[in-house]
């Protein structure tokens, strides 16, 4: 069976991705202490962010990571189906099937999902960044965004390889159509632009339609009358 990925994770960014994941595994996750009338409670930083409806995607995208992201999205919808959810993206990309699972869940749930690039959104990371709610996709000013075509490996009999090659082409077309729908580009333009790695800074990603805003500083909350 073909294993289809956005290929960036498997060459230039392999060391980067591995370093992130190894660093998370080998370091202590910060804890946040909250005090109330009932005493103190300790939360790991990611659980505390989840209480604020913030999900952090900070690694390569595989089935395990996708399962965690999808579970958090569904949980937050059950908590409040009207309030926005925020996904902060710093990812080199990864598995297409895992990424599409996250994408479908983002579109399925009722709350708007706002996406913010912090550091890098490459490959499937860029795809998910662009998939946030229209008008609610952003990047910090020095982030890097990259799009390209998916890659996949195939083995077995010649007939099996042909079938798998056709499947990869179908997936490529699907991804191009989805990205075109979120950026306002036509499908052929997306195909040409993603033929090879296309790197963009935040302003270029804004011009391309992957994001809607570039934030140098978090906007101040609106004052209530």
Swiss-Prot record:
Cleaves peptides in various proteins in a process that requires ATP hydrolysis. Has a chymotrypsin-like activity. Plays a major role in the degradation of misfolded proteins. The gene is clpP. It comes from the Bacteria. Keywords: Cytoplasm, Hydrolase, Protease, Serine protease. This is ATP-dependent Clp protease proteolytic subunit. It holds the Pfam family CLP_protease. Its EC number is 3.4.21.92. GO terms for molecular function: ATP-dependent peptidase activity; ATPase binding; serine-type endopeptidase activity. Signal peptide: none annotated. It is an enzyme of class 3 (hydrolase). It comes from Chlorobium luteolum (strain DSM 273 / BCRC 81028 / 2530) (Pelodictyon luteolum). Belongs to the peptidase S14 family. GO terms for biological process: protein quality control for misfolded or incompletely synthesized proteins.
């Amino acid at each position: 069976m073909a294993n289809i990925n956005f290929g960036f994770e498997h060459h230039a960014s392999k060391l980067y991705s591995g370093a992130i994941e190894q660093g998370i595994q080998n370091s202590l996750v910060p804890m946040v202490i909250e005090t109330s009338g009932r005493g103190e409670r300790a939360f790991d930083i990611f659980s505390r962010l989840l209480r604020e409806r913030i999900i952090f995607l900070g690694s390569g995208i595989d089935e395990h990571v996708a399962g965690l992201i999808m579970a958090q999205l569904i949980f937050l919808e059950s908590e409040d189906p009207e309030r926005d959810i925020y996904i902060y993206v710093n990812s080199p990309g990864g598995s297409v099937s895992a990424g599409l699972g996250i994408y479908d869940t983002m579109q399925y749930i009722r709350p708007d999902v706002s996406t913010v690039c912090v550091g890098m959104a490459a490959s499937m990371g860029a795809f998910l960044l662009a998939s946030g709610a229209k008008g609610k996709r952003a990047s910090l000013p020095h982030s890097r965004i990259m799009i390209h075509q998916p890659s996949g490996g195939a083995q077995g009999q010649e007939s099996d390889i042909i079938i798998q090659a056709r499947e990869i082409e179908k997936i490529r077309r699907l991804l191009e159509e989805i990205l075109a729908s979120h950026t306002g580009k036509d499908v052929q333009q997306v195909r040409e632009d993603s033929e090879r790695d296309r790197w963009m800074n935040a302003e270029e990603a804004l011009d391309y339609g992957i994001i809607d805003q570039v934030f140098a500083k978090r906007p101040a909350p609106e004052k209530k009358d």
